[in-house]
Amino acid sequence: MSDVTIVKEGWVQKRGEYIKNWRPRYFLLKTDGSFIGYKEKPQDVDLPYPLNNFSVAKCQLMKTERPKPNTFIIRCLQWTTVIERTFHVDTPEEREEWTEAIQAVADRLQRQEEERMNCSPTSQIDNIGEEEMDASTTHHKRKTMNDFDYLKLLGKGTFGKVILVREKASGKYYAMKILKKEVIIAKDEVAHTLTESRVLKNTRHPFLTSLKYSFQTKDRLCFVMEYVNGGELFFHLSRERVFSEDRTRFYGAEIVSALDYLHSGKIVYRDLKLENLMLDKDGHIKITDFGLCKEGITDAATMKTFCGTPEYLAPEVLEDNDYGRAVDWWGLGVVMYEMMCGRLPFYNQDHEKLFELILMEDIKFPRTLSSDAKSLLSGLLIKDPNKRLGGGPDDAKEIMRHSFFSGVNWQDVYDKKLVPPFKPQVTSETDTRYFDEEFTAQTITITPPEKYDDDGMDGMDNERRPHFPQFSYSASGRE
């Protein structure tokens, strides 16, 4: 590939994602799609640490005159999350120059990717998603909504719902995430959805939720995922108030193992919190993200402060600095602090005060905590991501070597050879005692599958189908 060059550079005002002030940043747009910002104009274009660094590949651009004239918004992907970044410049001409340059780079990258996909459908793991998976469904009959019994509602969000289902043919239980296409397409979430599908397909780790099938109907996308019914860690912790250090060490080790795996594949999870940590029926961790807790992105005019849980935000995310893998180690610090101390390390109902605590306040520990536990949590909750435990080039290995985890055999962790400290009291795979009663008490309302023909595609209007090419997938093609 040819050398990466600068397409455009200059000063722009960037709006904070969480703390909504404007900051001057010197941005460079490069041919590889990177859009990187610095506090000062860099003397050397290969400076190692830009404050802001994201890709304009597959981005969408919007122009608006609010909250300031000559504003433009870039909406793009960070793993499975759609993010928006807001900029403004002094003149309409300047804005036009930036948006045209960004669009041109994004279009060229799109063409290059299409050419690559046509040339080598299965040569890279990143591209397995659509080609190989679609091929696999030619040997295994494509799944439809008729293939499942719909048992209980497990969760609900902006884009759809998660339902406990039973596969008729095998009798196995799964969690099916059903997304309405109109909602996703209306909110420009197609890229997000397809990326999430590809990430799930390529993910194989004992402590990460795996995808069994994905398919589409006329108006829905369906992900059929591994189902674990041991309940959210949040549920168990709120019942017991605190976990012992041994129990926390067990869960912490399984989380570190999973994050190490993701990071080795250049994926930052970014959303670690108790609600996304579940237990399987044996008491092992499963990191899930049914993608329903994110409340979507509002339009540019309303600029909702944030989606997600502010208590878990790392300082570098709050300050709109570039962030990488170390953001996950901050998240690990917060969840392990909660487990051992029974409360969040930083909390205030007033979000402005909460942000100030996250950025400025030192953490305090209960006297009962061991020195190893204090040392681990202090290291994980260092404000500067470059100084944080795990923030160096060794990433997870740095945490694995910490004295808190001494005596842990990491291969045994991965192989599930360690005995879980708690076994959920579930009587069967359909036992949903650990799920939120608000959901499990509801009756399930989805359009009856009989309304679809066997393919589930009959009468598909040409308006919607092209957004989701080759979406079907069956894991059995790989096993």
Curated annotation (Swiss-Prot):
Keywords: Acetylation, ATP-binding, Cytoplasm, Disulfide bond, Glycoprotein, Kinase, Membrane, Nucleotide-binding, Nucleus, Phosphoprotein, Serine/threonine-protein kinase, Transferase, Ubl conjugation. Two specific sites, one in the kinase domain (Thr-305) and the other in the C-terminal regulatory region (Ser-472), need to be phosphorylated for its full activation. IGF-1 leads to the activation of AKT3, which may play a role in regulating cell survival. It comes from the Eukaryota. Interacts (via PH domain) with TCL1A; this enhances AKT3 phosphorylation and activation. Interacts with TRAF6. Interacts with KCTD20. Interacts with BTBD10. Disulfide bonds join C59-C76, C293-C307. Changing D219V: Enhances kinase activity and causes low seizure threshold, sporadic tonic-clonic seizures, brain enlargement and ectopic neurons in the dentate hilus and molecular layer of the hippocampus. It is a peripheral membrane protein. AKT3 is one of 3 closely related serine/threonine-protein kinases (AKT1, AKT2 and AKT3) called the AKT kinase, and which regulate many processes including metabolism, proliferation, cell survival, growth and angiogenesis. This is mediated through serine and/or threonine phosphorylation of a range of downstream substrates. Over 100 substrate candidates have been reported so far, but for most of them, no isoform specificity has been reported. AKT3 is the least studied AKT isoform. It plays an important role in brain development and is crucial for the viability of malignant glioma cells. Residues 406-479 form the AGC-kinase C-terminal domain. This is RAC-gamma serine/threonine-protein kinase. It comes from Mus musculus (Mouse). GO terms for biological process: brain morphogenesis; cellular response to insulin stimulus; homeostasis of number of cells within a tissue; mitochondrial genome maintenance; negative regulation of cellular senescence; negative regulation of PERK-mediated unfolded protein response; positive regulation of angiogenesis; positive regulation of artery morphogenesis. The modification Phosphothreonine is found at T305, T447. One of its GO terms (cellular component) is cytosol. It is an enzyme of class 2 (transferase). The modification N-acetylserine is found at S2. Binding of the PH domain to the phosphatidylinositol 3-kinase alpha (PI(3)K) results in its targeting to the plasma membrane. Isoform 1 is expressed in prostate, testis, uterus and mammary gland and isoform 2 is expressed in prostate, testis and mammary gland.
